[in-house]
Curated annotation (Swiss-Prot):
Disulfide bonds join C29-C76, C39-C53, C54-C99, C74-C113. Keywords: Disulfide bond, Lipid-binding, Signal, Transport. InterPro entries: Bifun_inhib/LTP/seed_sf, Bifunc_inhib/LTP/seed_store, Plant_nsLTP. This is Non-specific lipid-transfer protein 1. The gene is LTP1. One of its GO terms (biological process) is lipid transport. Belongs to the plant LTP family. One of its GO terms (molecular function) is lipid binding. The keyword Signal applies. Residues 1-25 form the signal peptide. The keyword Zinc does not apply. The lineage of its organism: Eukaryota, Viridiplantae, Streptophyta, Embryophyta, Tracheophyta.
Amino acid sequence: MAGLVKLSCLVLACMIVAGPIATNAALSCGTVSGNLAACIGYLTQNGPLPRGCCTGVTNLNNMARTTPDRQQACRCLVGAANAFPTLNAARAAGLPKACGVNIPYKISKSTNCNSVR
């Protein structure tokens, strides 16, 4: 039940962050959070890294091919990171590498998504 509440908060935070952003991005924060839902325990409770988490990270990376999409995904991730006070910052920053995925920015609460290309 607590996981469902956290996921709901993540989705809500993503929608709030993405609401005022007008871009040409095809990615929504709902898509981003849906792909990363399996990562919540790993990022907030120091649980094991589930295979489904890395599948979501890979899928998200494959969807974010344009600069607007990468910037939008970044904004969603920053919003989600800020919504979780128990987020393990080191695990969040290292998540792409742990999943064997290379993204052009660091996942953190303070990433400048406008600089993402």
